[in-house]
């Protein structure tokens, strides 16, 4: 990571935060216009963002639960008819505990939390976890967000699952997969995330562990035309325009 990422700031008011993070992550603190690194973590007046450098670099990446695409999805995303809401089984279990093994930018977890789910997000990549935590902390400024049950832990999902003692009603996973034809926004995010994080090559191992740890079901988000993950066949599949949700139903313990 030291060869690809550096820390910077766009306002002197956030210099001390940038210096602190650079020390914590053992990364260089550079000028805002530096092009010596593939990515810059930038402290702006509004938020923490990830920028790609270069002449054809996509726009910055940051987490905002209060406005933009994420907030729009909360208000106009289709309510309980959304595939992800149906896939996690809210009809039969209205307020489930959900373990999201691949939190990413937190969008799916945010949707589920808005429907009364108690969601624990797991993110293994420290940079993505920083962006997500920054978005969570800024959203605490509004009362309705404070009431959501949404928590983040930065840890490798395999390590967390292998030592997990409690049972979650649902374990959810959206592993990184090859870029397909999507909207400009998703293309930008996928390009940045894939360069930074890479593919989730351990998705089959995570599925095998999740099937042993979940109480009611395991839900895997997949590209519409892709094969299911290696292992047992899903019991139910919810198909959308470009993606689908493979659902593995678990029998109650005797």
Swiss-Prot record:
One of its GO terms (cellular component) is cytoplasm. InterPro entries: 16SrRNA_methylTrfase_J, SAM-dependent_MTases_sf. One of its GO terms (molecular function) is rRNA (guanine-N2-)-methyltransferase activity. S-adenosyl-L-methionine binds at residues 107-108, 123-124, 174. Disulfide bonds: none annotated. Belongs to the methyltransferase superfamily. RsmJ family. This is Ribosomal RNA small subunit methyltransferase J. It comes from Coxiella burnetii (strain Dugway 5J108-111). The gene is rsmJ.
């Amino acid at each position: 990571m030291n060869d690809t990422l550096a820390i910077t700031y766009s306002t002197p008011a956030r210099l001390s935060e940038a210096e602190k993070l650079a020390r914590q992550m053992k990364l260089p603190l550079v000028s805002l216009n530096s092009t010596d690194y593939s990515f810059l973590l930038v402290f702006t007046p509004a938020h923490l963002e990830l920028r790609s450098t270069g002449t054809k670099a996509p726009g910055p990446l940051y987490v905002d639960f209060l406005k933009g695409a994420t907030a729009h999805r909360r208000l106009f995303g289709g309510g309980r008819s959304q595939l992800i809401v149906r896939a996690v089984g809210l009809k039969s279990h209205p307020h489930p505990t959900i373990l999201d093994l691949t939190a990413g930018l937190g969008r799916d977890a945010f949707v589920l939390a808005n429907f009364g789910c108690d969601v624990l997000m797991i993110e293994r990549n420290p940079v993505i976890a920083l962006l997500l935590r920054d978005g969570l902390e800024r959203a605490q400024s509004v009362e309705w967000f404070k009431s959501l049950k949404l928590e983040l832990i930065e840890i490798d999902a395999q390590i967390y699952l292998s030592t997990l003692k409690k049972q979650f009603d649902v374990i959810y996973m959206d592993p990184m997969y090859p870029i397909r034809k999507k909207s400009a926004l998703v293309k930008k995010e996928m390009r940045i995330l894939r360069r930074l994080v890479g593919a989730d090559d351990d998705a089959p191992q995570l599925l095998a562990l999740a099937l042993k740890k979940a109480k009611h079901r395991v839900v895997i988000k997949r590209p519409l035309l892709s094969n299911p993950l290696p292992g047992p066949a899903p019991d139910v599949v919810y198909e959308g325009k470009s993606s689908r949700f493979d659902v593995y139903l678990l029998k109650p313990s005797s």
